[in-house]
Amino acid sequence: MFRRKRTMSNVKEIIESGKAYLGIEFGSTRIKAVLIDEEHNPIASGSHTWENRYENGLWTYSLDDIWAGLQDSYRDMAENVQKEYGVTIKKLGAIGFSAMMHGYMAFDKEGKLLAPFQTWRNSNTGKASEVLVDLFQYNIPLRWSIAHLYQCILDKEDHVKDIAFTTTLAGYIHWQMTGEKVLGVGDASGMFPIDMNTKDYDEEMIQKFDKLIEGENYPWKIKEILPKVLVAGDAAGILTEEGAKKLDPTGNLEAGIPLCPPEGDAGTGMVATNSVAQRTSNISAGTSFFSMVVLEKPLKDLHTEIDMVTTPDGSLVAMVHSNNGTTDLNAWVNLFKEFADSIGADVDMNQMYGTLYNKALEGDADCGGILSYGNYAGEPITNVEKGRPMVVRTPETKFNLANFMRSHLYTALGVIKVGMDILTKDEGVEIDTVLGHGGLFKTKGVGQKILADAINTPVVVMETAGEGGPWGMAILAEYMVKREEGEKLEDYLKNKVFGSDAGSRIDPDPEGVAGYEAFMETYKKGLDVERRACVDL
């Protein structure tokens, strides 16, 4: 992926001359800072572990948690630079901040937080979401910022009249660093719907929302309190003296460093996997799964199963999210490991995964009739309310290890398949390639083949499968400074970041495609059994 490796003296010179780029991302359990050189290589990182709190019925992080975590992740990175290269960071080429999207942060005209920060995990916005979906004829998920704001209005919360600014976590940090009330279009698309032609909030929906709440007589209109939307490559302000001290309380970091538009974790993930071009997709397959498909044009119909966001440069993205992923698969692998230990077999977990996953490829294309569900949590897309892992078979089922493992790999992708079918079959969306990343793809070629057959599309897996969100954010910071006039983000990534790293590609196999379709027919029929288990068991 990266162009060339640097010597230690090269890196020291880059850092001292202020030519390194910094990306910091707030994940739900970890805040990570990644420093890269001019060739996009990560040269240092730092992190801070944190946890959300459940207070007064809401998931939140306190402002103290936010600032302590930011400073600690930066300090950890800076100390690693000092230890590794013997240099103190004073200047940087550019900085970018990213964070988990959505949620609710509302401030008054003095900059005071009016209500506790509500994270994306809060689902107390059902009524608001329902009203807004009906009003806009556009999917507004429970976690979106506009749903949180409208729920506060429905609940007659007193603070709403005093709102002067509402933003996301990344937008808040950026504002405190620069004084600029701006947001990258990808993160903004999780606050309020975006018009892909103007790369700004959808004007028709803005007017509909203002009309919806005009009887409340608030002293603001919705666009007045939302952040200004910027796209990747736009200048988004410079680090102020106050901002520098908030990031680095030691005082070593100097003011005046340019910042790029703050982004959401979905956007940085797309950058890190080289998946921002139209007709491309990336699928993350870990403890939960999600797929993101970059569209050429808006969808024809409203689909509540599909979330609409954008790339950092403003292309429309259809996102399918599955609450469940590899957890049930892992449980079965652990069970077989326990059996191996019980008979005295010396097998490590890598060998166990490799053996069982590869065994799945020996199974029948339709799993021999075995049906399984790996739901550890509820699944809105399939209307399953609770976690009920299940294996079902008939007396005629070909019950063997290969079919058993294959069924569990198949079902792990079941919800993603339902969502992708809406896009490709119902909406006619065309996808050239999918980039797969995450735990499902660690055993070479297995998860990749199953996914290619499931969605009938070529799947590429890179050796690194991307360096993660904070690295993607650092790339966006660098792109703002180093892009040529008119150079698109997708071209910058393709030609200057990822270069010749095309990864390994597996094309769908007609027999496998037909087998997966047969499995999905049974999967859909069996969902009533799964739903009944949520009630009776």
What does each model-found stretch correspond to?
Residues 82-119, 139-141, 174-186, 190-195, ...:
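Short beta-strand-loop/turn "lid" adjacent to the catalytic site in phosphate-handling enzymes
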Residues 117-127:
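Conserved beta-strand -> loop -> alpha-helix junction used to position metal-binding or nucleic-acid-contacting
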Residues 9-17, 22-23, 89, 127-183, ...:
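Active-site core segments that coordinate phosphate-bearing ligands/cofactors
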Residues 2-115, 162, 223, 245, ...:
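N-terminal glycine/serine-rich phosphate-binding loop of ATP-dependent small-molecule kinases
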Residues 33-35, 40, 95, 122, ...:
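Conserved small-residue
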Residues 49-50, 120, 323:
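A generic structural motif
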Residues 59, 133-137, 225:
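Short glycine/proline- and acidic residue-enriched helix-loop micro-motifs
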